[in-house]
Structures are given as structure tokens and as C-alpha cells.
């Protein structure tokens, strides 16, 4: 659970040093039933939805603006804003796969990525890490790092992108929103 500054300090150090970082939070902070996920999709503004029918994938952007989103999403956005440098932009996207279907082949992003696994399981391969992410697992992937994500079942993964210059060190504590 994100109740002290250890997570923020570890994440900030990993971002500053451009190292992969793994952690986890209480899965109840991200747990949602499929009915609430479908409601989130159905009520999300059309201009903030991207659909890839050939991969059974839906992407919802700017979730932090929604009142119905899990509070942890807004908490993570605030954390990233607090440790980011001026001029950086923080993005959030929910990747929803409605089957165990291919996702992304080997890729590297031009921005730093923080993945939060919310529902279902995915196989993540990044550097020397080859692990199954389950609800509550968090992984930071520095920009330019090769990685592969393979859904093992229907899933929801929150992805936070950080564009711009390098992250500064965390200066303050970080607590979960109630």
C-alpha cells in the first residue's frame, strides 16, 4: 500500500537513474468488477477512447478527470506531478483487453512508463525481468527500454506516461487517497 514515502523515493530514484523498478500495492485499491469497467467504457467521452478490434483492445485516456475512476489513479498522477520536472507531461491510459489476445510485440517507448496491473494477468518481459503481473503489481520502465506485454487473460492495465526531461528526486511523502 502507498502509505509512506518509501514507494515515492524508490520510484523517484529509479526514474532518476533510468532503472526498472518493481513494487506492489494492495490489490483492493485497484479492484473493480467487470460491470464497473464496462460502465467506465460506456460513459467515457468518445474522443478519449481508442479501439483496436483486431486485438480486442480498448484504450481510455485522461481517466484522472473522471469522478468514477478509482482514487489510486488520481493519487499516482499527483505523485508523478510532484516528482516531475517542469515541462513534463503526465498521461494516463487504461488498456483493456477483452480476451487473451496479442498485445504489443517487442517495443520501446519514447516516454517513461509506469504500469499498474488492475485486473487479470499479463506477462511482462523487460530487461532481466520475466514475470506475471497481477492486480496491484507496479512496474516502472524507463524510456528507450525494450519490453513485451502479453495478456494471459482479459485484463485492465493502467499506464502512466511521463514525457519530457528526467525526473528529479522525491522531496515529500506520499500517501494513498481515501
Where do the PLM segments sit?
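Active-site region of the double-stranded beta-helix
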Residues: 4-5, 38-137, 145-177
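Conserved beta-strand-loop-short alpha-helix elements that form
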Residues: 140
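N-terminal auxiliary "cap/dimerization" subdomain that precedes the catalytic jelly-roll/cupin core
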Residues: 1-57
